[in-house]
Each structure stands twice: as structure tokens, then as C-alpha cells.
């Protein structure tokens, strides 16, 4: 059952990248399994969606300060997840879309000047001292009045933790925005987008 507290924490996890909220849900799964919480998260994802989460590894809770480097997911897994979500092939797809559509400081639309207003965005950002990323579905408008959904996954990694987290996050976020602009311009030509 999806309680009001769980609803609130789910929004905090998705909209604000609240690591305590994330750990709450990992711990919730931990209570229902003989596996550890992280192992149960991975097992649950793969059991329910074996074709989607092929290269995802969940091995740890998110430590204090968010310095987790051992949990992994591939860009292709993110794409498969977003595609399955868009076509309502996941449990609770409508709620997941609602959560990913909540306003946030995304890196695929906000500040990406080439992408017109009115483009729908369903996304999740992620940042550590070694990774800056955003994955999402953008739904562009065509000149024919139709909507054109596409996935965008931007991930920038570095081998060692940055010493200046804010600068790292801001500069890499701007790089992702620029690639999002380039992607939109390419699709604009292909599909006669607004």
C-alpha cells in the first residue's frame, strides 16, 4: 500500500534527489526479504523487468554525503526503462510519469535554449563527485500538431572525485544541456518539429 508518507518520500527522492528518502525505500524492501536491502532492490527490478535492467547493479545504500560509486546502471538500461515507462509497460507507470514530470532543475530542458517552451519533460537528475547526469523523456511538438517523444540520457563520469563539487556539477550540467540542444536540433530537422 502506497501511504501518504511513502508518497511524500517518493516525491522527495525523485524531485529533490533526497538520499535519505532513497534509503528509506531500500530499507522498506530490506524488511520484506532475506537479501540485503540493496540486493533486494536489484532483484525486484530484474525479476519484474528482466529485459530492462540488464546492466544495473545495486550493491549499497547511499552513504552520508551521497558518495556512492558502486551502484551502476547503463545508459541503455535507462533508455529501456524510459521506453517501457512511456508505453505503460511498468507497474505504476502513471505514478512514475507523474513523479518524473514534477518541476526540478533538470539538465535536458531548463537552460537548453534550443528546446521550445511547451516541450513536456519527464526526467531524473543524478550527481555525485564523480558523475553528473540526467535521463528523461522529452515530448516535442511537431508542426503537424503531433507529439514526438524521445529519450535523452546524458552521463558524464570522471575517474576520481572532484574537489569542487559545485563547479563540477554546473559545468558538466551545461555540457549535458548543450548536447540536449544538439539532439533536439537534429530531431527538428528529421521530424519537422516546432
Where are these regions (language model features)?
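A generic structural signal for nonpolar/aromatic side chains embedded in well-ordered alpha-helices
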Residues: 13, 45, 99-103
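Structured C-terminal helix/loop/strand segments within mature extracytoplasmic catalytic/sensor domains
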Residues: 85-109, 113-120, 125-194
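Mid-domain, small-residue-enriched loop/turn segments at the edges of structured enzyme/sensor domains
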Residues: 5, 10, 16-88
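Active-site SXXK
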Residues: 1, 13, 152
Amino acid at each position: 500500500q502506497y501511504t501518504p508518507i511513502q508518497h511524500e518520500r517518493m516525491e522527495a527522492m525523485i524531485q529533490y534527489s533526497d538520499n535519505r528518502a532513497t534509503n528509506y525505500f531500500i530499507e522498506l524492501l530490506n524488511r520484506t526479504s532475506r537479501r540485503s536491502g540493496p540486493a533486494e532492490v536489484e532483484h525486484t527490478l530484474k525479476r519484474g523487468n528482466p529485459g530492462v535492467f540488464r546492466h544495473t547493479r545495486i550493491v549499497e545504500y547511499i552513504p552520508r554525503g551521497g558518495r556512492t560509486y558502486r551502484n551502476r546502471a547503463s545508459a541503455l538500461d535507462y533508455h529501456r526503462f524510459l521506453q517501457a515507462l512511456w508505453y505503460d509497460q511498468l507497474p505504476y507507470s502513471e505514478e512514475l510519469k507523474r513523479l518524473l514530470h514534477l518541476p526540478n532543475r533538470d539538465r535536458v530542458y531548463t537552460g537548453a535554449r534550443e528546446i521550445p517552451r511547451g516541450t513536456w519533460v519527464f526526467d531524473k537528475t543524478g550527481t555525485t563527485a564523480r558523475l553528473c547526469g540526467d535521463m528523461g523523456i522529452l515530448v516535442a511538438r511537431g508542426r503537424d500538431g503531433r507529439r514526438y517523444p524521445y529519450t535523452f540520457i546524458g552521463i558524464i563520469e570522471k575517474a576520481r572525485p572532484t574537489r569542487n563539487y559545485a563547479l563540477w556539477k554546473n559545468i558538466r550540467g551545461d555540457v549535458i544541456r548543450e548536447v540536449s540542444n544538439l539532439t533536439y536540433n537534429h530531431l527538428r530537422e528529421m521530424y519537422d518539429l516546432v
